[in-house]
């Protein structure tokens, strides 16, 4: 079989002079001249030397599992999917197609574009991709690149998994929650709806290879040789810079002025610093015009979308590229033209605390293997250069060897919902590469129980099954379902999309005019209604990009929200949930929307304790303030802060801020939250007040029922 597969590429891909009639076996069309040019580049990749042994292992592995270990830039992410496509083609597609998972949607999109180009095929036909709000596949697709969380959602849903001949789990060393869980499910053979002879290929950096070998029980392993050439010797700074962005900009300008050949890759901790660096460099490189074409400055982060392809395109007149990125490009996005690397040695990551149900933005050193992967970007003949904006002792003393598994740092409620959907009653029955903390699992189960997603036996309830269908956080999915009861589905669809998409506001207003335009979008009822108002104004503008720029809005995020809203609407129609007519702005709709939100977010309620905006969280007695971006704080003549608020998120990274906040009435909390939730609140004045309201409501209900009974008895007596 392997020898036959070799023939697909080696013999059907001759030079144009050797055969003008060679056709592509995937679509039956003659190869283009670009195919041969790219084929020569592919054959020069380090992974090409391992092609034959990989195909042998893929055919003969007793367990159906093959492990591939290779450094960033060796070509494994682009070539292995193509070889697997040849594998299923040689079988006449009798055993399904090839699915490749990626930990980041942007990586799935970028790889699909590149691989379709290398295979001389049309994107969306034989090669496609599936990422949030964008499914570029068709009936002819045999090679699909997919965000790993989407595949996990498919596996858990009633839609089934479809036929797959080969499943490739790429970039396993990134340790995403979905990738780790997919490996656990596959290892335990719990994907019963997949073909029995499914092939699984796990692709990783060498740093995680020993752990994966042990986890999978010693499967056949392909070790990709290192790139030719040596790695640069890193140059360290004596101390951490006071301003990372300025230090990185100065280093870039120095390299450009020295006319050192090659492109530059800059690693900074966050998207905010990436944007600041790109803005600063774009201004400063204009001074280099007298030395030739100014460098082209390009950001690379999850919000780039299809613009990511600019990092691969040739620049006009041979201008240098300066790519500014963060942890996203530690292992993904191989850029062969990079000769210089600037590494801040830091990353900004969200870390979830289950004890207080809060996220914090943690600035921390990257792992040692991440730092090594960054340095390898500049390997070659001769080696490039690597400037580390930190002392040599910084990582040696403070950095772990491997990246932290995301299963230790994320809210696991959605994960638990999927495990329950797979009928794994106990988390202990599922194998993890690294087991989550017990308190994180217990908090996730407790949250699902409060949301009525579990029955008395701890299995998914009927409501929980429906919740698991939605690509939303469980509490947001519950609020969306509650909107069916309260007749505000249209507004909740918009709100769910806006809360799930990237943030719509990119930055604070830069001038008085922009601030006034943005203030006009604020709604008196709070941030949730403001988000709905922003979306509706965006749609009324015709999704105009200039309209967004004038108000400091993220046009790409709003477009993403529009797509997601359409997906959610289609899903609700498919499972036959009731819809409602738009009624945004009416008094009744305002109350109904609050009730729907409280139905899902009763765990996220706070009370102003002293009338000054110091809010005490009901569930954990932490004190927090409203975010500076909250509409209640941005009003010119602020009244007394709302007494009771519902919030979307609580961050403990800076000043304990509540984000996306709206006022609610405590009576709604008593009416809609489970009674045992109120009973389990920690002792506080707020709990006593809510329990008093509950008793009054119970007494009122008893009196009303008694009055109705008396009236019925009187009516019977008259008869």
Swiss-Prot record:
Annotated region described as Disordered, given as residue ranges: 1-21, 694-719
Motif (DEAQ box): 170-173
Superkingdom of source: Eukaryota
Record has ATP-binding as a keyword: yes
GO molecular function ontology, one term from the record: helicase activity
Keywords per UniProt: ATP-binding, Nucleotide-binding, Nucleus
Cellular component terms per the entry's GO annotation: spliceosomal complex
Comp. bias (Acidic residues): 8-20
Record-annotated Helicase ATP-binding domain positions: 57-225
Function: Might be involved in RNA metabolism; it is missing helicase motif III and may not have helicase activity.
Protein name: ATP-dependent RNA helicase homolog DQX1
Organism: Bos taurus (Bovine)
Taxonomic lineage: Eukaryota, Metazoa, Chordata, Craniata, Vertebrata
